[in-house]
Amino acid sequence: MRISVTNRCNFRCTYCMPETKNVDETLSLDEIYEVALAASKCGITKFKITGGEPLIRDGITDFIKRLYDIDSVKDITITTNGFYLCKYAEDLVEAGLSSVNISLDSLKKDRFLKITGVDALDDVMEG
């Protein structure tokens, strides 16, 4: 089950988000947890955490730990732009995250900047 925990993002990719748009979350992590709990009771065992950029959501690593407290949950993956991975990698491992998908738009700095609106390829690669 795909769970979008935020619409906010630190990038402004041409294919995803206009320059001025940065919508606040509409559901709390507690509310999202209740949805995940209900889904698990219907047989869902795998969750994919997405956004926007899920790593800018306060409390995301605790939320992942909490999802793993649901007995039937077997696998949690996160999709990220990679910018904050260095900052959160250890916490994500401790939370039990199964895997990480990184959206990498280009390995060329100028093209990366043009697509994402952010000069952050080095930060993403470090992550």
Region spans (language model):
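Conserved alpha-helical substructure of the radical SAM core
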Residues: 1-76
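Conserved AdoMet/S-adenosylmethionine-binding subsite of the radical SAM
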Residues: 58-127
